[in-house]
């Protein structure tokens, strides 16, 4: 299955199966999971990057334990809407995951400022110290990314006159 746009992705997800969201960074991959109604995203895990094959195995194990049916990967677009080096890296991650599991639907979601937004919430609203923020910010950013994709998927379904 190729990488899909968000509408195709939404159509490819079976009913009552969750999806995961990824916030890939240089050292870690934040992972979030949706509920089965595709309404709410929650932080799930932080994968510390090692070898791609090991990281992918960890991700697929997490997905299997949650019966997740698809992957939303954050795409850190530049503020002017162009794609930089990090976007290329995240797109390569998607292609490489598809090589290992070609049946899993994958889409990308613009994640501009997701980490900054989550960090601001952690500092201003929860007074979380720097050490604790480092432990949770990437998986919370993954939830932020996934929540945005879920809301767009819901909008697509509603515009088509379908329940979600």
Swiss-Prot record:
Q: Which CDD domains match?
A: YqgF
One GO CC term, this protein: cytosol
Q: Give GO BP annotations, semicolon-separated.
A: rRNA 5'-end processing
Give the UniProt subcellular location, in the record's own words.
Cytoplasm
Q: Does the keyword Hydrolase apply?
A: yes
**What Gene Ontology molecular function terms does this protein carry?**
nuclease activity
Which SMART domains does the record cross-reference, listed alphabetically? YqgFc
Check the record and name the InterPro entries matching this protein.
Answer: RNaseH-like_sf (IPR012337), YqgF (IPR005227), YqgF/RNaseH-like_dom (IPR006641), YqgF/RNaseH-like_dom_sf (IPR037027)
Enzyme Commission identifier(s): 3.1.-.-
Keywords of the record: Cytoplasm, Hydrolase, Nuclease, Ribosome biogenesis
**SUPFAM superfamilies, alphabetized:** Ribonuclease H-like (SSF53098)
Q: What protein family does this chain belong to? A: Belongs to the YqgF nuclease family.
> Its function?
Could be a nuclease involved in processing of the 5'-end of pre-16S rRNA.
Official protein name in the record: Putative pre-16S rRNA nuclease
Organism the protein comes from: Caulobacter sp. (strain K31)
